[in-house]
Amino acid sequence: MIRSTKVMGVLNITPDSFSDGGEHCQPNRALKTAQRLAKQGAHIIDIGAQSTRPGAELLAPEQELKRLLPALLLICQARQEGELPADLLLSLDTFHAPVAAKALELGVNWINDVSAGTADGAMLPLVAKAGCPYVLMHRRGSSQTMANFCNYNDVVSDVIAELQQRSAAALNAGIKREQMWWDPGLGFAKTTSQNLALLEGLPQLAAHGYPLLVGPSRKRFIGEILKENRAKARSWGTAAAVCKAIAGGAAMVRVHDVASMRQICQMADALWPNEIA
């Protein structure tokens, strides 16, 4: 089997995301970005209307839908009409079940939940009924509080244990194991050293059999290491983290710079052909 790490392109329809807030709030601009990401080689586009950066304002589901729907409707219609590749997958980055339900109704393929089902008790039953792929990301606390929850005994072992707990809850809700992906949640309730430890420990996560989605793109820990405050100037640091993730068994990486990271994935797949999660 030839390894082919998948690329998830980021499309934030938010005014306050840490990297590209406000750039895609207009539906036409969001569609153009989706088309660009697809042309650059994204296998899946992750669309989000709720910023999850530290300290971000939390929206009610109704507010999130109001922000999301104009762009999402346009993107889904474009895929139906051939303005986007028919095989392009769409993911929704949300932790609200009503938002996920509406998106699935419109044709979204994946749900990417940074809360792993803890923020909305209706999410796991919804995903079970839909049968769609579901990303369980590790975090502690919320966007407002997660900086207070970086106290791990061993960050790799603790993240694995907590993802196992959420996976068990998902299984109990009727979600099938083959629907689930794990995301270690780089930057969410983790210090720089803990993020590095998680990248080093990815083979331990991969050993549990869930495909891994890893999202290091432009994260603060990269900026701290590079002493680079500008999120968009962290591409080379992101590239190094993407290589490390693939070497550790990541099956998919979530990135902003799809064209360059697609090349990096192809090269990393050739360098580490047997590390398939």
Indicate residue ranges for each PLM-predicted region.
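N-terminal glycine-rich anion-binding loops that anchor highly charged ligand groups
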Residues: 4-9, 35-49
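N-terminal substrate-binding region of glycoside hydrolase catalytic domains
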Residues: 12
